[in-house]
């Protein structure tokens, strides 16, 4: 059964998972997380479970992490690993997972779609050579006996996933898609996340009609966190978000993003004058408005393709891509600039629409932004100051903050 714990940051999701693991010593677990620091925390918090992180430094497994992973699964060992490694599990590994009766714990959203850049001619060569087949826009491997280099990455990925083609009006896109067996092979699955409905793992479950139920977090009198079916614990800080997140209200600086699609990826590509004005605004913000703030307290994030267009003196090396959710390296940063206006890319939307899923782009944008903001010092309980030039993005954050006005924190 898939159980979704959709709770705000700091509600105790990871702590509840640790409690669950420690209270079920007879079960076997695979815990996946965006970053290795969290894997280390799970190992430390569950000493009796003896979690192992698969390694690519072991000679007996040919210095390949996936071979070490396969051996650990076959032995029924508890594993802590990253999202990226998890997405490469092969059918043989999934067979062993079913046999062993593993429980899966997914910490944060897993991207179920990944764009893959490959010429159609290369795919056709592989088809003509009898290595792969194509049916209704889906490519899968039929002959594993390929030892070349030119298509090594393609064959490596086809071991664990299917490649799909999505035809747009002006281009053809290719995507790797997670197989539903990656979820269905486990006895139980816990998904620890926030703003679940805006995330790809939610759409994935809907597409494949995989049933799920919600669980909450209970916080007992001794300070322990546990999964529960009743009303959940809400951390006390949420009632003070208005006092913790200071959103810049500067009409002159905000004017650059008044339009609904201003600061979208397309806007950056087609509006050089606007981009230059935005760069000047960011410089003004850090040079004059926040001029006394140390460089190591600054953090700004946009599309990677916009970095060179927006970089400037005093903040260029404080860049963190807008969709980062897997780092604690910026937890001392207090003065933020978020010059983006996120919309789901065309290929993703076409894939979901093809499967009857209508995505909520506002929820998607909010979930990405909140994860980025929580890379800063607010995760440590400190106040932050943030400049969000896009009106749409800024209002999404303000409405989200307002939504906590009527919430009463629960301690149990």
Predicted features along the sequence, with ranges:
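Walker A/P-loop
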Residues: 1-18
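Conserved Walker A/P-loop ATP-binding site and its immediately adjacent core
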Residues: 16-57, 84-85
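Conserved RecA-like ASCE P-loop NTPase motor core of nucleic-acid helicases/translocases
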Residues: 27-38, 189-193, 289, 297-304, ...
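Inter-Walker segment of RecA-like/P-loop motor cores
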Residues: 48-89, 303
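Short basic/glycine-enriched coil/helix segment immediately N-terminal to the Walker B
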Residues: 72-76, 90-102, 184, 295, ...
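SF2 helicase catalytic motif II
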Residues: 84-86, 94-140, 148-165
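Conserved RecA-like P-loop NTPase helicase motor core
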Residues: 84-89, 112, 314-396, 403, ...
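Conserved helicase/translocase motor-coupling segment
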Residues: 178, 187-188, 194-326, 345, ...
């Amino acid at each position: 059964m898939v159980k979704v714990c959709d709770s705000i940051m700091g509600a105790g999701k990871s702590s509840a998972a640790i409690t669950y693991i420690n209270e079920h010593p007879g079960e076997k677990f695979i815990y996946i997380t965006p970053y290795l620091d969290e894997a280390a925390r799970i190992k430390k918090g569950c000493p009796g479970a003896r979690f192992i992180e698969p390694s690519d430094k072991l000679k007996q497994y040919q210095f390949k992490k996936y071979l070490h992973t396969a051996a650990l699964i076959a032995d029924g060992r508890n594993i802590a690993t990253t999202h990226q490694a998890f997405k490469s599990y092969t059918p043989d590994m999934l067979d062993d997972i079913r046999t062993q009766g593993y429980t899966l714990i997914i910490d944060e959203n897993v991207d179920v779609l990944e764009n893959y850049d490959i010429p159609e001619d290369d795919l056709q060569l592989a088809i003509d050579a009898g290595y792969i087949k194509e049916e209704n826009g889906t490519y899968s491997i039929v002959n594993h006996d390929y030892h070349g280099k030119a298509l090594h990455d393609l064959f490596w990925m086809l071991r664990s996933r299917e490649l799909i083609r999505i035809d747009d009006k002006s281009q053809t896109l290719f995507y790797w898609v997670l197989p539903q067996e990656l979820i269905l092979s486990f006895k139980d699955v816990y998904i620890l996340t926030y703003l679940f409905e805006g995330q790809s793992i939610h759409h994935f479950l809907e597409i494949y009609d995989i049933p799920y139920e919600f669980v909450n977090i209970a916080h007992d009198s001794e300070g322990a966190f546990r999964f529960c079916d009743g009303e959940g614990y809400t951390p006390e800080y949420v009632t003070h978000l208005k006092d913790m997140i200071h959103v810049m209200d500067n009409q002159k600086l905000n004017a650059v993003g008044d339009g609904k699609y201003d600061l979208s990826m397309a806007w950056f590509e087609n509006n050089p004058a606007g981009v230059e004005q935005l760069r000047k605004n960011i410089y003004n913000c850090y040079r004059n408005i926040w001029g006394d703030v140390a460089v190591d307290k600054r953090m700004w994030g946009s599309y990677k393709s916009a970095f060179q267009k927006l970089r400037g003196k005093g903040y260029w090396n404080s860049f963190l891509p807008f969709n980062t959710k897997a780092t604690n390296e910026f937890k001392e940063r207090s003065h933020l600039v978020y010059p983006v206006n996120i919309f789901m890319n065309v290929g993703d939307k076409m894939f979901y629409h093809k499967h009857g899923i209508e995505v909520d782009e506002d929820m998607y944008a909010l979930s990405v932004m909140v994860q980025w903001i929580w890379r800063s010092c607010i995760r440590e309980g400190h106040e932050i100051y943030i400049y969000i030039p896009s009106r749409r993005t800024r209002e999404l954050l303000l409405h989200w903050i307002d939504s906590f006005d009527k919430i009463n924190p629960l301690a149990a």
